[in-house]
């Protein structure tokens, strides 16, 4: 089990309040399994993993925003392809 010093994570994010928001957001992703951890889990809870990722500079709000934008684009493309496929199937029926 890794020890996390919050001060190191605060230095990466800027202030404690943003750290709390960022860590909570990342921990939620890990808890819901919408994202894989970027560090070894080592039996740690999602909140500790999130803090370790932040401390190592692997995660911040900008990175998570970019990931979510990418996911939204991928989902939109998949939905358009599905609609196109269904329209083709219906037209050929």
From Swiss-Prot:
Gene Ontology CC annotations of this record: DNA-directed RNA polymerase complex
Gene3D superfamilies noted in UniProt: 3.90.940.10
Q: In the Enzyme Commission scheme, what number(s) does this protein have?
A: 2.7.7.6
Q: What is the originating organism of this protein?
A: Glaesserella parasuis serovar 5 (strain SH0165) (Haemophilus parasuis)
> What superkingdom heads the lineage?
Bacteria
Query: Assembly and partners?
Result: The RNAP catalytic core consists of 2 alpha, 1 beta, 1 beta' and 1 omega subunit. When a sigma factor is associated with the core the holoenzyme is formed, which can initiate transcription.
Question: Any idea what this protein is called?
Answer: DNA-directed RNA polymerase subunit omega
Keyword tRNA-binding carried by entry: no
């Amino acid at each position: 089990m890794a020890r996390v010093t919050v001060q190191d994570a605060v230095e990466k994010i800027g202030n404690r309040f943003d750290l709390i928001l960022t860590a909570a957001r990342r921990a939620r992703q890990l808890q819901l399994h919408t994202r894989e951890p970027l560090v070894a889990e080592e039996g740690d809870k999602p909140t500790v993993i999130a803090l370790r990722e932040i401390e190592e500079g692997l995660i911040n709000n900008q990175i998570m925003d970019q990931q979510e934008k990418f996911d939204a684009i991928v989902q939109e493309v998949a939905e358009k392809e599905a609609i196109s496929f269904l329209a083709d199937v219906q037209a050929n029926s």
